[in-house]
């Protein structure tokens, strides 16, 4: 089974707090309850979104910082995922 | 009798919770009361919507994840359906 | 006497609840007080509306599902009508 | 003395309730206090309004149904008039 | 000393209530406290305003009906003036 | 040290009330607490702002009337300045 | 490890209050709790943002005045950073 995001949407999986800490990035106290770092699992094709051409710059496997609590959560085969728009991605983390 | 959605609208039928669980996708507790997975029954022609060209990417028979509680519910011959805009579709589920 | 809607507006007449039920479509309880199915009586010419070209896709005589309680009601020769924008039409019902 | 509306604005004069009733159109109770049918007295030239080209479709002398309580009232030589935008006109009444 | 309005702005001087009455136009009671008729003193050059080309249609010396209480008041050499956008002008009064 | 405003922003210095009065312009009582007349100290390059081409019409040294209390205040070497957008300038005062 | 901002976003580091004061710029009391002067650490590529072409004018190492409390804070290797959009930068400080 595969989730194919539509338009500029991407499917991400938030990283556990321990993993985040290990990678050297710690999120401030105010966001302690929900990690803001995620791995990109699937990427939509982009194209015309709201009448504007959107080019996808994130790729499968990227580690990203996500801006907001927004997004729709789904559970697939027991794992939690979130679908967000690419514009909710603030930055890509390169190792 | 047939429902022909206008513009970028689509007619969907939400899947029963049991069917959703069987397919390996479970929705989080917060949305327990209303399943977010639906089957596409009819698709509008797209075209110019709000002055922007909208191309339809969902097709009849697609299984889709729907973003919001929005949409207009109607009952046809005893069955419940919902009319939403294509932009309310987050992703297509492929088996 | 004739009502000629301007731009993308259409003149509709809501169908009585009994007629709606007979046609096999029943609206959910939450909208019991006002039927959402209407017949199209007159259609505006479309053209440039809010700076965007609008093409009319509904026709005189169409049976339509209407999205909202919006619209302006008027009474002509004792009959109640409503003027809405075409974008308030969700779908056309074909027999 | 003459009032020359600017852009897509028009000068209208609301019809007395008696005149409205005589013409076969009765407005619902909720708008009893202010008639919604008016005669067009002067029409602006249209042109670029809010960056969009607006073509005037109402003409001097048209009887029109007006959508809202909006508009600016003025009294000229003892008579009450209202200035509205053309987009506040819902339909033209033809005899 | 001269005030040069920027873009689509104009400098106006509201007319005293007595002058307004003399000219045959009386404003309704609800606006009794502030006359809505003004003389145009200076006119901005128009040009690109908010990304849209605005052509100035009011001229120095025009008598205008102004739509709103908006605008910024200033006092120059003891006289009160107001700066508004051209779009706040509803109509030009011709004698 | 120099402040270089970005885009359509300008750095201004509000004039003391005494200077304003001397120049023949008095602001109404409602704005007594903060003078609305300012001198332009630095001007941004304009260019594409919010996707629209903005041409700068105010110049260093201009005396301007400013529309709002908005803007960001900063203190440089003990002097107070404000950064506003050019669109917050209503008019230029010429002597 | 490197943070690569997306689109028109930039990664900044706010300067300590002491550094700000030393440089001759003092922020007013109302913003005492959070300095508004920052150093630019990383700059996104710009490109199409919200359907508009954005050209980046700030560069790595620039000292900038930032307009708002907005932005997302992250901690990298024990240091606090903030991700903002370029439009939140009011001006560049040149020494």
UniProtKB/Swiss-Prot annotation, chains A, B, C, D, E, F, G:
Keywords: Chaperone, Cytoplasm. One of its GO terms (molecular function) is unfolded protein binding. CDD domains: cpn10. The keyword Cytoplasm applies. PROSITE patterns: CHAPERONINS_CPN10. GO terms for cellular component: cytoplasm. Pfam families: Cpn10. Signal peptide: none annotated. It comes from the Bacteria. Coiled coil: none annotated. GO terms for biological process: chaperone cofactor-dependent protein refolding. It is found in: Cytoplasm. The keyword Phosphoprotein does not apply. Heptamer of 7 subunits arranged in a ring. Interacts with the chaperonin GroEL. Together with the chaperonin GroEL, plays an essential role in assisting protein folding. The GroEL-GroES system forms a nano-cage that allows encapsulation of the non-native substrate proteins and provides a physical environment optimized to promote and accelerate protein folding. GroES binds to the apical surface of the GroEL ring, thereby capping the opening of the GroEL channel. HAMAP family: CH10. Belongs to the GroES chaperonin family. This is Co-chaperonin GroES. It comes from Caldicellulosiruptor saccharolyticus (strain ATCC 43494 / DSM 8903 / Tp8T 6331). The gene is groES.
């Amino acid at each position: 089974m595969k989730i194919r995001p539509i338009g500029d949407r991407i499917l991400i999986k938030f990283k556990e707090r321990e993993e985040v800490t290990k990678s050297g990035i710690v999120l401030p106290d105010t966001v302690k309850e929900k990690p803001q770092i995620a791995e990109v699992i699937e990427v939509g094709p982009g194209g015309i979104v709201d009448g504007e051409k959107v080019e996808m710059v994130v790729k499968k496997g990227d580690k990203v910082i996500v801006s907001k609590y927004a997004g729709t959560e789904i559970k697939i085969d027991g794992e939690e995922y979130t679908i967000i728009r690419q514009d909710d991605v603030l930055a890509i983390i390169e190792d």
